[in-house]
Amino acid sequence: MKNKLLLTTAIAGLTAITGFAHAETKLSGNMEQTFKASSIDSGDSGRGLGTEMNIGLSSSKDLDNGLKASYGFNLEFDADSSDSTNDVYFMTLSSGNISFSVARDNGQNLSSTVVPHISDQAGTVVDGESFGNVSTADAHNYDHVRLDAKAMGGTLTLRYAPDASNTYAGDSAIVDSGQSNSEIIYSGNLGVDGLAVQAGYSKLKANGSSNEDIKYDKYGIAYNFGQFAAGADIRREDSGTVASKVEKEAVRYGVTFAANDNLSFGLSYQETEKKTAGVKSANDEETILVGVGYNFGGLGIDLNYAQVDNLGHTANKDAEFFQIRTIQKF
């Protein structure tokens, strides 16, 4: 009877410890599978399957000095690679509405958009798009330090990446390439329910006197009317060399309709213009994206169809893309 009591006490203690550990540490993951087909005038056409798997571990703890510490990382596995990549990590100290982080590929960023859409943006669905979702000057993707402040119904972020060449796992001995990256972003609703606003500016310092600094700014606004949502944004990027500066500007509009809790439809239009050494391209790139998304509970599936005129600003180079994506979270 005594041994049974000791065993019961031990099991109860182990259960309590295990429950505490689970409350503090979180394990998450997902698997994304994509089929894409393309048809490009005067170019390559094809189809293929791709898979991406992610496993993440995160934890948080209240410190003795009153601050809260949060930390975690994510391992990405791709179908065409035998190795995993630690492309995401963060260590955050926070107090009230202010937090400080050392991180990579973490926190709010300028590759996201407030413009309503279904699943992937056009820059992901369309291969070879002139102005993709992510600018080279997006400091979010590099090892960086970051200050976040909750204000004005949203979050204000100040970010600095001392070395833009460091985007994967490295050590403290990594050599600085001389390309530092600084960024400021606000996203939130300004205290208005249904409103979404995004504004940001990023600058990547040029490497060498013959190159231009890469400057990127983005402004977007959207409103959710219930079942309907609509929005627009504008993106601009200056890059290239001093002798041949490249300027791009993309204006995008999008609407979505939620038929019910599981089924949604989306439509977006984007027009991109390009200047090289001050001379505007004769052909603006135009993209129409139509999307449908359905949530089966443990499985999400979306279909996107994109039609592009003057792909890459090349006259009469029109293209069509069709993508099916499934994502399972665990």
Kindly label every feature range from the protein language model.
Residues 1-330:
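Outer-membrane beta-barrel proteins
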